[in-house]
Amino acid sequence: MKRFAMSLAALLLVPVLSNQADAAPKTRYDATTQTCRVLSDGPLEWESRPWGQGGKLFKEVCKSCHTRNNDKGAPFLWVESKNPDAWNRVFATRYPKCAKNGSWNGMTQEQLLVLNDYLYRFAANSQDPNDSC
């Protein structure tokens, strides 16, 4: 009887303990397209991670100039250089020199969105479950 009670208690605790809290942002409002992008499910869940298209674009495109001691005069950047709202502002207003001088022209609109998703998701102070659409 004691073994049965322990087994039953263990079975009841499994669902409770398996619900892990995830503080990463689940959605992102994009001002350029006026849409709410779901980052926690579907293809964007994968693409907005470091190994997805967003992370690869950051490493291949952005980090080709924005490295330490670069000869292009570009400031050093890493994912946590800005908070999520600041990264959204960068893509909505396109104020950096690299956006104005045509360096972004080699990327499609969808690639820019996925890059913004990645930077938003892993930005400084982005691990706040209340910071989303």
Features from the language model and the residues they span:
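Detector for the c-type heme attachment site
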Residues: 64-72, 92, 103
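The canonical Cys-X-X-Cys-His
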Residues: 58-69, 115
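Short Fe-S-cluster ligation motifs
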Residues: 89-111
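Electrostatic cytochrome c docking/interface patches
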Residues: 25-57
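Bacterial N-terminal signal peptides
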Residues: 7-16
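Positively charged n-region of N-terminal signal peptides that target proteins for export
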Residues: 1-4
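C-terminal capping alpha-helices of c-type cytochrome domains
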Residues: 105-133
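Sec/Tat signal peptide C-region and signal peptidase I cleavage site
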Residues: 17-23
